[in-house]
Amino acid sequence: MAKMQGRMQGKVAPGDDRGDGLKEKMVAINRVTKVVKGGRILGFAALTVVGNGDGGVGMGKGKSREVPVAVQKAMDEARRKMIKVSLKNGTLQHPVIGRHGAAKVYMQPASEGTGIIAGGPMRAIFEVMGVHNILAKCIGSTNPYNVVRATLNGLQAMSNPAEIAAKRGKSVEEILGLEK
């Protein structure tokens, strides 16, 4: 199992932009081998994230015998599986915890100028979806697949003030405490 090392981790390969305004990042490439009678067959699995810079984000996995084909399959799947997350001034609405498998991710909104304080796969997600200020911590498993899924589960679970106001039958101002 080969992890992406050094300068290439989380970088976009040149020529990946399709002109549709989406940002693409490769999170991990895994080399796998299948042992057969005649020797070993190499294969590659790629994990990528795609975002529109305005709260839209998707993750994709691709497998192939060659790296570029695996990455392309992953990018295509990520485009198909995009979700929309409502942001508040370039950060989250409220603190949230996401879980998937043994991975647990804690994400908290941060004040302007903080930047993205998050590790590895989480950083790639926040960069492509347009989050500029956030504090995030990965607890438990740091497997990139599980961390990405846990992050997306947490982001999907986050609710905005309009949803909460509709549930409670109140106005958004009452929920935010702006009305006296």
Curated annotation (Swiss-Prot):
The S5 DRBM domain extends over 22-85
This protein's UniProt keywords: Ribonucleoprotein, Ribosomal protein, RNA-binding, rRNA-binding
Q: Does the keyword rRNA-binding apply?
A: yes
- Molecular function terms from GO: rRNA binding; structural constituent of ribosome
UniProt-listed InterPro entries: Ribosomal_Su5_D2-typ_SF (IPR020568), Ribosomal_uS5 (IPR000851), Ribosomal_uS5_bac-type (IPR005712), Ribosomal_uS5_C (IPR005324), Ribosomal_uS5_N (IPR013810), Ribosomal_uS5_N_CS (IPR018192), Ribsml_uS5_D2-typ_fold_subgr (IPR014721)
Q: Name one GO cellular component term.
A: small ribosomal subunit
**In this record, what's one Pfam family?**
Ribosomal_S5_C
* Entry keyword annotation includes Signal: no
Which biological process, per GO, is one annotated for this protein?
Answer: translation
Q: Note down the stretches annotated as region Disordered.
A: 1-20
User: Domain comment, in the record's words?
Assistant: The N-terminal domain interacts with the head of the 30S subunit; the C-terminal domain interacts with the body and contacts protein S4. The interaction surface between S4 and S5 is involved in control of translational fidelity.
HAMAP family named in the record? Ribosomal_uS5_B (MF_01307_B)
NCBIfam families listed in its UniProt record: rpsE_bact
Family named by the database record: Belongs to the universal ribosomal protein uS5 family.
Q: What does this protein do?
A: With S4 and S12 plays an important role in translational accuracy. Located at the back of the 30S subunit body where it stabilizes the conformation of the head with respect to the body.
Q: How does it assemble?
A: Part of the 30S ribosomal subunit. Contacts proteins S4 and S8.
Q: Which PANTHER family match?
A: S5 DRBM DOMAIN-CONTAINING PROTEIN
Protein name per Swiss-Prot or TrEMBL:
Small ribosomal subunit protein uS5
**Origin organism of this chain?**
Nitrosospira multiformis (strain ATCC 25196 / NCIMB 11849 / C 71)
Gene expressing this chain:
rpsE
